[in-house]
Amino acid sequence: MDEGLWAWRQTENHNHMIEMQEKLPAPAADGAVELAFFGGSAFRITSPSGLTMMIDPWRNPPWGTWNWYLYDFPKVAVDIALSTHAHFDHDAVHVLTANVILDRLIGTYEFADVKITGIADKHVSDSKHNAYDWAEMTRRLTPMKTNPPDNCRSFDNCLLIIETGGLRILHWGDNRPNPPDSVWDKIGDIDIVLLPVDGSYHVLSAAQADAVAERLQAKLIVPHHYGIWDVTTRGSTLLPPDEWVNGRKDSIWADGGSVKLTADFVKQQSGRVFCFGEHVAFDKPIARGTGA
């Protein structure tokens, strides 16, 4: 009874949503879309009209035996908070100051110049390509069922498609690489895919990431779910994505934690990787201290 959402204690309000509610521009409105990286699998997307969305904010494991992150997720206010699935490194929507929370969305939500579609599928449950084979360890060491169709809730995954600024942006979450054809059909054409790729190949192997990118034919591929030395702990086992990124043709390394993308620029690309690397869109607390 003492746990749960704490919005009742927040001093903020949803006046920004009331203002935007009166305008209701079309989802295809022109203008740049800002993509900001917050480490882990967390991205803030800002539509041309100024609607802000945070997908997959992270937290440390609630059982407290070890940490994945060196500090708490930054204090951020957004209009809409979203999560792809119920794992600690993706589900911390409660730490945000958000006007709307869409946790594991299945179906469609539309507001202002944004349309969000959630497609139900399954989390990766075969991790033999990873050095630690964490999925097999989970099955052996815990009562948790990871294999579909009888998996536990935390091994569901919702693919999230954000449509705004003339772009269709897909957040893959930790989805399996081989969803059924019916899911691929629902995904449709994608301009930008946010894909989980790291040097340990925790979620997708290099070959799986390449295959997903090829199947989607996305214009830009943005890696996430990778290790950053001053964000993630060594205990996470995550590694930087450099090997995979540098193995792709004409990859772009960002020079900051956010970028503004226009439909004209994105649609001129063809399977090009855009990686934020160690850059994030907040001041890293450890960088202001004395070191790790």
Predicted regions: what is each one?
Residues 1-17:
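N-terminal non-globular leader segments, chiefly Sec-dependent signal peptides
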Residues 27-33, 47-53, 109-116, 162-169, ...:
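Beta-strand-turn-beta hairpins that frame and shape the catalytic cleft
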Residues 78-86, 194-196, 220-225:
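Short internal beta-strands
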Residues 144-216, 229:
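Active-site-proximal loop/helix segments of hydrolase catalytic cores
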